[in-house]
């Protein structure tokens, strides 16, 4: 079973995360940021990952540290769960709607940590959550999972819908990339 648990503690956050890449979408997520909790639950459900998250953070300062660090820890856990990466598809992509929002995402589990996004200059809050923090989450994930991740907002006006489409698209994209399709490392170099 491809699963991993990661614990990370800093002066700003304390996060324990478990993921099973071959799960069925079960989740137990507890963070001090309600919208982040909702997005992580959506990620687990639509990617069919089993996910447990216990997070504490200095939300009296900002949601930034907690959101970014959850992305970092998720990236570390996925990297650990993938092990030697033998047999994985490596690439994944999806285009997902959420009402008026439409989001494209693509990933290459390449060993080259990069993150690119286009957000149509959308700014604002979803309740108390700064929309722009989703990009910090995805950047943390991409860097720590050593993946190249692209997320492009193709359309959308309601920030909640755009953010949710991003997380659902990301989940489906990642699920596609971690699928086991063969036996060797999917690279002409022989390593990722």
Curated annotation (Swiss-Prot):
Question: What Gene Ontology terms describe what this protein does at the molecular function level?
Answer: imidazoleglycerol-phosphate dehydratase activity
Q: Which GO terms describe its cellular component?
A: cytoplasm
Organism domain of life: Bacteria
Q: Chief location of this protein?
A: cytoplasm
Q: Which PROSITE patterns does the protein's record reference?
A: IGP_DEHYDRATASE_2 (PS00955)
Keywords, comma-separated and alphabetical: Amino-acid biosynthesis, Cytoplasm, Histidine biosynthesis, Lyase
Spell out the InterPro entries in the cross-references: IGPD_sf, ImidazoleglycerolP_deHydtase, ImidazoleglycerP_deHydtase_CS, Ribosomal_Su5_D2-typ_SF
Which reaction does this enzyme catalyse, per its entry? Answer: D-erythro-1-(imidazol-4-yl)glycerol 3-phosphate = 3-(imidazol-4-yl)-2-oxopropyl phosphate + H2O
Q: Tell me the route in metabolism or biology where this protein functions.
A: Amino-acid biosynthesis; L-histidine biosynthesis; L-histidine from 5-phospho-alpha-D-ribose 1-diphosphate: step 6/9
Q: Share an example GO biological-process annotation for this protein.
A: L-histidine biosynthetic process
Its EC top class is lyase
For this protein, what is the EC number? 4.2.1.19
Per the UniProt entry, the disulfide pairs are none
Q: Where in the cell is it found?
A: Cytoplasm
The entry assigns this protein to a family as follows: Belongs to the imidazoleglycerol-phosphate dehydratase family.
PANTHER family per the UniProt record, alphabetical: IMIDAZOLEGLYCEROL-PHOSPHATE DEHYDRATASE, IMIDAZOLEGLYCEROL-PHOSPHATE DEHYDRATASE HIS7
Full protein name: Imidazoleglycerol-phosphate dehydratase
This protein's encoding gene: hisB
């Amino acid at each position: 079973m491809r699963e991993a648990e990661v614990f990370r503690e800093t002066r700003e956050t304390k996060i324990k995360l478990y993921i099973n890449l071959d799960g069925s979408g079960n989740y137990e997520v507890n963070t001090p940021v309600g919208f982040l909790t909702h997005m992580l639950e959506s990620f687990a459900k639509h990617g069919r990952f089993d996910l447990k998250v216990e997070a504490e953070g200095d939300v009296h300062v900002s949601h930034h540290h907690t959101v970014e660090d959850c992305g970092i820890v998720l990236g570390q856990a996925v990297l650990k769960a993938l092990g030697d990466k033998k047999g994985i598809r490596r690439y994944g992509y999806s285009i997902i709607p959420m009402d008026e929002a439409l989001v494209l995402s693509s990933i290459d589990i390449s060993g080259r940590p990069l993150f690119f996004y286009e957000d149509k200059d959308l700014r604002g809050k979803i309740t108390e959550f700064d929309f722009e923090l989703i990009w910090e989450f995805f950047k943390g994930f991409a860097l720590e999972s050593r993946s190249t991740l692209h997320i492009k907002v193709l359309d959308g006006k309601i920030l909640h819908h755009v953010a949710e489409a991003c997380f659902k698209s990301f989940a489906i994209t990642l699920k596609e990339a971690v699928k086991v399709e063969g036996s060797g490392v999917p690279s002409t170099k022989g390593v990722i």
